[in-house]
Design a protein with these regions (language model features):
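A glycine/proline-hinged amphipathic helix-loop "lid/cap" segment
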Residues: 1-78, 319-320
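Short beta-strand element of the alpha/beta-hydrolase
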Residues: 86-95
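Short amphipathic alpha-helix adjacent to the substrate-entry channel of hydrolases
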Residues: 104-123
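Alpha/beta-hydrolase active-site loop
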Residues: 132-153, 310
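Gly/Ser-rich "nucleophile elbow"/oxyanion-hole loop immediately N-terminal to the catalytic nucleophile
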Residues: 149-164
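Hydrolase active-site cap/lid region
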Residues: 179-233
Length: 320
């Protein structure tokens, strides 16, 4: 798709335009002007106010902990519908620029994916930057996936049916985990990627077109990445999965993108790269919406369609 547009604001649908206007009028302070602790608190409190309310009902919601390679205990939350047989597992890795986000900010989304995908969802609270810079989040995500593969049965889950997913920075981490899983011969049914970051440098047309005024702005992207990674590491495929030497043999892939998002072009490029490598890819581009819309369901109803599409992709992958 081409992200060159003379009036990109005209692409926004009515609900998204209204939300952006309300946020602008509210004088929301930019994350880049906050400390990481302030930004996390702001997102934890403010984010859920724009998501579906009340939170969708799921039969089983349980806080658990997973073990990282250095002995760190990673908090996680298990969501599961009632089922007589062992459920398949989606490891979900939240977005937030590797710097913010939590089990709280993505609670509604994980409930939706569990309900609609008829699967267990394990939401991971991985360590954040700048306190824990690259590649800690990669290690935590991969360690969690391995833990579930080896120990998921202790939670009553089916470890032979495993998927990984995430949004934004979490989508990057999920894509990296899918590459690692292929190399480790750990079979995945699906990688589920909402607007993932895929490239080393943010220089696509969409990064210029949607740099300001579309929820995720350039200053915030720069702040996130300065928190997380040194310039010398930017070409590492564990930050930029597009840079992996080979994409053949990856799990079937579902990618959901927002049309008015700085990251949309790299998401399309990644889908094309996977297809060229022979990977089965289902790409959905949601018109008129912005980065982060899947956790803004109260404000942007298109989130519900994306939830349904992703849930269907999970269900189909686990039933194959």
């Amino acid at each position: 798709m081409s992200s060159h547009h003379t009036n990109p604001r005209s692409l926004l649908n009515a609900a998204t335009h209204s939300l952006i206007e309300r946020v602008h009028r509210a004088g929301r302070p930019p994350m880049a002007a906050m400390t990481p602790a302030q930004a996390r608190e702001f997102y934890d409190i403010g984010g859920p106010m724009l998501d579906l309310q009340p939170a969708p009902q799921v039969d089983r919601v349980e806080d658990i902990s997973l073990r990282a390679r250095d002995g760190h205990t990673m908090p996680a939350r298990l969501y599961a519908p009632r089922c007589e047989t062992a459920l398949p597992i989606l490891l979900y890795i939240h977005g937030g620029g590797f710097s913010v986000g939590s089990l709280t900010t993505h609670d509604v989304l994980c409930r939706q994916l569990s309900r609609l995908g008829h699967c267990a969802v394990v939401s991971l609270d991985y360590r954040l930057a700048p306190e824990h810079r690259f590649p800690t989040a990669v290690h935590d995500s991969w360690d969690a996936l391995n833990w579930l593969h080896q120990n998921g049965q202790t939670l009553g889950l089916d470890t032979t049916r495993l998927a990984v997913g995430g949004d934004s920075a979490g989508g990057t981490l999920a894509a990296v985990c899918a590459l690692m899983a292929r190399d480790a011969d750990l079979p995945l049914r699906l990688q589920l990627l909402f607007y993932p970051g895929c490239i080393a440098r943010q220089d696509t047309a969409s990064h210029h077109t949607f740099a300001e005024g579309f929820m995720l702005d350039k200053a915030t992207v720069d702040w996130f990445f300065n928190n997380y990674i040194d310039q010398a590491d930017r070409d590492d495929w564990r930050f930029a999965p597009m840079n992996a030497s080979d994409h053949a043999g990856l799990a079937p892939t579902w990618i959901g993108l927002a049309e008015c998002d700085p990251l949309v072009d790299e998401g399309v490029q990644y889908a094309d790269t996977l297809r060229m490598a022979g990977v089965a890819v289902n790409l959905e581009i949601y018109k008129g919406v912005v980065h982060g819309f899947i956790t803004l369901g109260r404000a942007i109803p298109d989130a519900l369609q994306a939830h349904a599409d992703a849930g269907r992709a999970l269900k189909n992958a686990f039933e194959r």
